[in-house]
Amino acid sequence: MKPTKWILLLMTACSTLHAQAANEKQVRRITLEEAITLARVQSVNAAVALNELKTAYWEYRTYKANLLPEVNFSATIPGYAKSYNSYQQGDGSYTFVRNNYMQMSGELSIDQNIWLTGGKLSLNTSLDFMKQLDGNKEERYMSVPIALTLSQPIFGVNSYKWDRRIEPVRYAEAKARFLSETEEVTMTTINYFFNLLLAKENVGIAQQNLENAEKLYEVAKAKRQMGQISENDVLQLKLNVLNARATLTDNESSLKSSMFQLRSFLALSEEEELEPILPEMLPSVLVDYQDALNKALTNNSFAHNIRRRQLEADYEVARAKGNLRQMTLFAQVGFTGTDQEVRGAYDPLKDNQIVEVGVSIPLIDWGKRKGQVKVAKSNREVIQSRLRQESMNFNQDLFILVEQFNNQRAQLEIANEADQIAQQRYKTNVETFMIGRISTLDLNDAQMSKDQARQKHISELFYYWYYYYQLRSLTLWDFEKNSNIDADIEAIVKK
């Protein structure tokens, strides 16, 4: 054979092997623990929970920064005006004068919010420059070397004081919610994992049932020729073959759908074919309701949520009461100077003092502000009633969950034993049918019981794991390690 033909054959073979390799998906065996680990790192749900935590973290940092001194600088460099403005003359009449000037100014201030009183204290220094561009082209400087300014509401609500009560609770709620949402990611993973596990098991069951149905149908045709069974039994077994093929097709479609869901949730490549491994090791845990309730009320975001909403309702009442009358004190003390030169603007200096007390008291508002107080109080009563109901529902749901989890191990053991018995019964019935002792109806019943028992076993295993992590989510307690579920929030946020 010529070398050219050898090369063509070799290239064809390589292309065929490459195409086969491309069509074959990489099989990845995955345990429940591995799926949970991947979901907590790669899933969209985990990313959403993390970004919500980051938002809460920076909101809390902003609140804390609002209580610290703030240094500000403002400037106009430069400002220019060429316009007409109204001017009142000595006899009281008005005329228009032309302005044509340039100005520059700068101010440096240190501002401090006073959380105890709700006021604001500022230390300022500033320098202004103005130059007339018409006439004598005079230049003037005005300095304020130092000025201390206080702005203090007298009767209004102290929002800083309320923030000191509400914001730490809000942040604690956000941290607890992040931990709970992480456990909820695990619960979603368990759901998708067992959906895939059950779908794969159903495909295996359907394949075995089809294989058995085809064998029994072949045996039945031979027996029919010998007159040992009726035509009706043969037709029934043929129908079983058709039903088994249809069931296998449906189950294979469900398997592909379940695999796609888990693969997408874990952010894995579509080239990977997942093979879930049935989890055999179970946490040996018995949960006490009162202990679980105490942990939930201490750790869960629900308790912080209740407290925050109570405080916010109280704040709204206080704010409505503060709006009944308003008084503000403004005071400024310092020194100022002005001159044609910068040095002269600082020496000599003169006192610069301002004191103002502003009062706003509604004389006739037809009960509007008092009505706002009544509305705030009524809203607080509504919120308190809802919180009591939510607390009762929370306690009830936790009680039911604890009972379900504690009973689930027994349910799982029963389902496991029933699965083994149903498998053995079906095997025995097949052998009995082969010798003509039972009918096709009995055989179909045994097969159905076998399939249902296997599915029930996997379903009960799913509920055990789901209830366990749901308890972890509500209590934020690791029952195996007997410790709180916690995380280094600072490190997580700053990644």
Question: What are these model-derived regions, one by one?
Answer:
Residues 160, 164, 366-369, 373:
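Interdomain signal-transducing alpha-helical coiled-coil linkers
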Residues 20-25, 72, 79-81, 270, ...:
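Acidic, low-complexity, intrinsically disordered peripheral segments
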Residues 48-63, 181, 185-206, 215-217, ...:
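Amphipathic alpha-helical coiled-coil segments
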Residues 40-155, 268, 293-371, 396, ...:
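A small-residue-enriched
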Residues 45, 163, 233, 302, ...:
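DHp/HisKA histidine-phosphotransfer helix
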Residues 1-26:
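Bacterial Sec-dependent N-terminal signal peptides
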Residues 23-36:
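Regulatory alphaC helix of protein kinase catalytic domains
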